[in-house]
Amino acid sequence: MAVLLPVAGGKGGVGKSIVSLNLAVTLAHQCRNTILCDLDLGGANLHTLLGLKNNQAGLGTYITKQETDFSNLLQATGIPSLQFIAGDCHYPGVANMDFFTKKKIIKNIQSLDADYVIMDLGAGSTYNIIDFFLTTYDGIIVVSPDLTSILNAYSFLKSAVFRFCYRQFAPKSPERQILQNSILQRMEGKEYSFDQILSVIASKFPESAEKAISEMKKLHPRIIMNMGRGHTDIELGNRLLNLTRNKLSIEAEYVGFVPYDENVTLSIARRQPLSIMKPDSPLCLAMPEIASRLEATVSGKDIFLEDVQENLEEIVNSYYDKLNKKDRNQYD
């Protein structure tokens, strides 16, 4: 069964699709059979970044039932070990698919024959985007080192945790009503952590609350800091970890630091992945370590660090150590 890697961004402009694309190429270069799936249905553009024409069947074709065999959506990219499923933005309204269509797409994605399926999601926090993000316990969220990105990522994770928790209880149940009431109280200026909300549910419905708490503990979002400028980003980046721990009662983890890379603009203009066009660029140097960290998580190795600041600081230091070593080798 393929490992699913849903990649979300709390807001547009954080470079989510660039990260998804180059991570997919990196995994393919490591001989991992990889499928890149464009699930940004309102603004699909990965075909452009790959240098492919948008003239083949995609998810829009499937949603509108013009193609009924999901496997026919797979197309070659010209890159060994990498296949692609287009979002197909020719059909208006496909981003607002019904629940059963979404469920069918998720089931088909889970059945794909590959080592990894990277799911590039749309920006924002609609239920469709969140449900694709929650196809795994440890989805990836891409942030940039600015306050609006950090706060939007927190808002996205808050919506995802609420959606995840809500789905643990039966429809029209009193437990769901307590969760809904917590949203109303938040609108009135009273905000509670998920620990506090679940404690209220546990006091009345201990059995169902225990199951929900057990599932909540499995949530482990992974974060990639993109367009970083250096060590000054660490303090800002750790705000997101502290917010998720204190307010959402979940443990998130940084798995990558991707520096700002001026070559990205040129790679977009040339319609060629940067990992192909200029594999020694700053962004591309960061990708193998991200792939290794993700693979270590999948293989069951415990790479989580309890000290949240050490987590991001270690990743930033590791990147610049690698960069300095590369620079030294050029002059040896």
Q: Where are each of the predicted segments found?
A:
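Walker A/P-loop phosphate-binding motif and the immediately C-terminal alpha-helix
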Residues: 2-40
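P-loop/Walker-type NTP enzyme "switch/lid" segment
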Residues: 37-115, 171-173, 178, 182-192, ...
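Conserved nucleotide-binding/hydrolysis micro-motifs of P-loop NTPases
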Residues: 41-43, 89-92, 124-125, 146-149, ...
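Glycine-rich phosphate-binding loop used to anchor ATP phosphates in small-molecule kinases
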Residues: 110-128
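Conserved catalytic-core segment of NTP-binding enzymes
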Residues: 122-253
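A short, charged, Gly/Pro-tolerant segment at domain boundaries
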Residues: 179-180, 304-332
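Nucleotide-binding motor/catalytic cores of P-loop/tubulin-like NTPases across gene-expression machines
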Residues: 248, 254, 259-270
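C-terminal boundary of histidine-terminating zinc-finger modules
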Residues: 269-286
